[in-house]
């Protein structure tokens, strides 16, 4: 593992040889990184803020996070090991002078430094517009041009605010944004980080009513990830041009920095090299790429240097990183691991634009695909055999683009063809419309089930649950739902799973004492037929 000092030296050497100089452009494209949480988890996997800004591979950094606000007293920040243990007297607000010094270094190099509010962990939100307006004054005093005895970054002044509001309610955020606009200069950046299902469960109405400079749409941990047939950048582009108060708002393609950075939705560089130029050429609202997070990307075999070259070269394929810029890839042990199996996966049809037709020839035994009328078809001894999904469900491709399942959906049309990851991207960028997975609703919770992969005997999926009130999830969360009779849930990465009949209970151990969202990986078996998603009703989170 590279030390922070050596990492910085390696980056500097690489930049000296290439002449790359990062700087924010109001017209884009830009590369943005979330920094502060060290989600890679190693003692040396997160370098200092200044190191990333000096790399020449970052146009903006999002300080992550100001995670507690408007719950009484002054707010709190959490930057993992980058700032720990030194609090202002009689508060839980950290004093981070080293980060303040690095903010100035970044700004001297043209890199924007944006404070991200919210995140998965923490407690936050407003109950009125007046609270939102008052909090704008707090941000001005603590991080802007105002005065306070408790300024975490000293006299450094941030360049913007990012609303990464994962849970709670929409109340007060429009008033907050409008008040920020009145206090800060016209070049102060205000962004948001909605999840890709449209409209966002929390920020949907806020995005329609307040003026944002960019939105970091999270294309991961959901059905609308970039490698699935429901990739919906076109939906967000349409919102930018028709609904957003700021018709020049930029849509950032936000992705995980490595396979361990998210529950699902990681896009390898080989696929990004197809997606990014397609987005850049097709959508005028495209603003570049945002990444969760710096610690993951910089420990992913040159991902960071290749991405920056890709985005700023107009999408042409960058050369492989030189040895001086390469960083050692680290691995992270997770609660669940992928088993190696000899089972033939129900791979999707390989002919772009074609749909299987019952009794017509096919070439790959046990190949699965969606038909034009919402059924699913299996290649059986050289012919397609079509079957109907259970009542009220339709055939939907999995998020990895390699298989299918039957699920509850909204919208109409066809999900056919289900094709490979690169072919899916081409189809999706063509503004393909069709049914998408229906949200799961429970008391005080909005959730999505993203089915990441299936084969003949097993499945993997991600439950993405978000609080819709100001009350967070606690350390222990019980998740209950009903599953079809042919499906057995057996594992989760957050705690034990028990299934009696078709009743499933997951005893999830939250990574945080309090959080506004839960992302739970689950696995299980398929006794017969194909994977059928659980009913969207009768879900409980307690």
From Swiss-Prot:
Region annotation Chitin-binding, high affinity: where it falls in the sequence: 355-406
Record's keyword annotation contains Glycoprotein: yes
Gene Ontology terms for molecular function: chitin binding; endochitinase activity
Domain GH18 residue range list: 29-314
Biological process terms in GO annotation: chitin catabolic process; polysaccharide catabolic process
Catalysed reactions, semicolon-separated: Random endo-hydrolysis of N-acetyl-beta-D-glucosaminide (1->4)-beta-linkages in chitin and chitodextrins
Annotated catalytic residues: 166
Prosegment location in residue numbers: 447-542
Subunit structure, interactors included: Monomer.
Family that this chain belongs to: Belongs to the glycosyl hydrolase 18 family. Chitinase class III subfamily.
Record-given protein name: Chitinase 2
Organism of origin: Rhizopus oligosporus (Rhizopus microsporus var. oligosporus)
Name of encoding gene: CHI2
């Amino acid at each position: 593992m590279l030390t922070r000092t050596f990492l910085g030296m390696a980056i500097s050497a690489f930049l000296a040889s290439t002449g790359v100089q990062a700087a924010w452009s109001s017209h884009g494209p830009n590369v943005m990184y979330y920094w502060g949480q060290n989600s890679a988890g190693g003692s040396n996997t997160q370098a200092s803020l200044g190191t990333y800004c000096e790399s020449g591979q970052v146009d903006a950094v999002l300080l992550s996070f100001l995670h507690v606000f408007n719950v009484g007293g002054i707010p709190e920040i959490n930057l993992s090991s980058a700032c720990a243990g030194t609090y202002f007297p009689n508060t839980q607000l950290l004093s981070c002078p080293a980060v303040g010094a690095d903010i100035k270094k970044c700004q001297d190099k043209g890199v924007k430094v944006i404070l991200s509010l919210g995140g998965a962990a923490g407690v936050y939100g407003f109950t009125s517009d007046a609270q939102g307006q008052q909090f704008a004054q707090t941000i001005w005093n603590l991080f802007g041009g105002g005065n306070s005895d408790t300024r975490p970054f000293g006299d450094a002044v941030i360049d913007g605010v990012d609303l990464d509001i994962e849970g709670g309610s929409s109340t007060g955020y429009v008033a907050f944004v409008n008040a920020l606009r009145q206090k800060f200069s016209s070049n102060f950046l205000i962004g948001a980080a909605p999840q890709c299902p449209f409209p966002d469960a929390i920020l949907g109405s806020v995005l329609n009513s307040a003026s944002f400079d960019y939105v970091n749409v999270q294309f991961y941990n959901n059905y609308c990830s970039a490698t699935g047939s429901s990739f919906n950048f076109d939906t967000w582009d349409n919102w930018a041009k028709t609904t957003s108060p700021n018709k020049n708002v930029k849509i950032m393609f936000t992705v995980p920095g490595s396979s361990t950075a998210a529950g699902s939705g990681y896009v390898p560089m080989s696929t990004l090299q197809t997606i990014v130029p397609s987005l850049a050429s097709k959508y005028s609202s495209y603003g570049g790429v945002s990444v969760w997070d710096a610690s993951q990307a910089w420990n992913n075999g040159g991902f960071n240097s290749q991405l920056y070259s890709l985005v700023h070269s107009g999408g042409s394929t960058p050369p492989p990183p030189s040895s001086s810029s390469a960083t050692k890839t680290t691995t992270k042990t997770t609660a669940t691991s992928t088993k190696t199996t000899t089972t033939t996966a129900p791979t999707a049809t390989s002919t772009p634009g074609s749909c299987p037709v019952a009794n017509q020839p096919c070439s790959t035994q046990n190949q699965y695909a969606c038909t034009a009328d919402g059924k699913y078809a299996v290649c059986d001894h050289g012919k397609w055999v079509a079957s109907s999904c259970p009542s009220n469900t339709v055939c939907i491709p999995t998020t990895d683009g390699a298989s299918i399942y039957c699920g509850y959906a909204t919208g109409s049309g066809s999900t056919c063809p289900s094709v490979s990851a690169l072919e899916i991207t081409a189809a999706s960028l063509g503004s393909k419309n069709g049914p998408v997975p229906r949200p799961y609703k429970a008391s005080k919770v909005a959730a999505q089930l993203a089915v990441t992969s299936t084969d003949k005997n097993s499945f993997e999926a991600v439950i993405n649950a978000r609080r819709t009130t100001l009350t967070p999830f606690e350390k222990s969360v019980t998740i209950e739902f009903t599953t079809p009779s042919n499906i057995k849930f057996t594992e989760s990465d957050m705690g034990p799973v028990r299934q009696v009949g078709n009743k499933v209970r997951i005893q999830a151990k939250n990574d945080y004492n309090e959080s506004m969202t839960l992302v739970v990986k689950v696995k299980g078996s398929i006794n017969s037929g194909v994977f059928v998603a659980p009913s969207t009703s009768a879900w409980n989170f307690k």
